[in-house]
Amino acid sequence: AVAARKSKTPIRTFAIGMQKDAIDLKYAKEVADYIGSEHTEVIITKEDVLSALEDVIGLLGTFDITTIRASIGMYLVCKAIHEQTDIRVLLTGEISDELFGYKYTDFAPSAQAFQKESEKRVRELHMYDVLRADRCISVNSLEARVPFGDLDFVRYVMAIDPEKKQNVYRKGKYMLR
């Protein structure tokens, strides 16, 4: 939102999803409308996913289903950005899940358990998420900037009282919102 306000021209935003039950597309559109971005939805089909599967597995060098599932969308949206635009540098939301929670922290039994899980995921970022994202982005001749990965920002968020980060409002990543 800050970048959109400061920019003289509308920033470009992208979201990917399938037509059916596209809740992420809905929320991305709401944000895009709110900040006034030039928004592009990349609608994919089951066939698109299946046809990209072999490329993504080869790219990642793993058959781990969680890693592959998390990579297909990023790979396909980056492919679309490369093929349909002249954009070559992206801002991503990578690492926000690890810092502010997602499905795995929505039901943490306590704030301390939430914090412990966040710390574990931040420590393991380089092994999974950063590598996965870098490969999916760079194979499509794009570069990523990851503002949530700024070390000072990570330290700041990790130092926040876990009670304040725990999802008691039933809104994912509510502190980030």
Positions of PLM-derived features:
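ATP-dependent adenylate-handling active sites, centered on carboxylate activation for C-N bond formation
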Residues: 1-177
